[in-house]
Amino acid sequence: MKKIDRETFPFYRFDRLAACREINHFVSSGVKDISFLGNEEPVRVVANRRELGENAGFELDRLVVGNQVHGADITVVTAEDAGRGAYDNESRLPDTDALVTDEAGICLMVLTADCVPVLLYDRKCGAIAAIHAGWKGTAADIVGKTVNLLR
């Protein structure tokens, strides 16, 4: 993983995914809160997400976030879902721990603390996935199920 030093909001990229120029990805440095579930004011979280987008190269209006429930449900994200969960928790996609899309310009985001974030890319079909893999989801094979969905 390589740190991308941006003055206002550093982030990380995985070397292997960074070699795939047709997609964009990031891992937040945690310098600023991008979760509505913490103690940060919602207006500040939105500003932090917008700033991260400016630094990492995604549009906040195209960000999609799900309501993570530590399960194994997978949601296929469409263009109509763009912006769900970007500006508030109420608009998140319901009860899902993996997001998959082949829509260009959509940014999928999962939030983790002690769970594992998994990012996948299938060059053949042009699909990406972002997975929140907690112990229950891992035991229920959320990663394997997501890989199978990408095929």
List where the protein language model places each region.
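Short, Gly/Pro- and small/polar-rich lid/capping loops
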Residues: M1-R13
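RNA-interacting cores
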Residues: R13-R16, C20
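Residues that form or immediately flank small-molecule/cofactor binding pockets and catalytic motifs
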Residues: R16, G30, Q68-G71
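Intrinsically disordered, low-complexity, positively charged segments
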Residues: C20-A56
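Phosphate-centric recognition/catalysis
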Residues: V46-R49, G53-I131
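Glycine- and Gly-Pro-enriched alpha-helical subdomains that act as flexible
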Residues: V118-R151
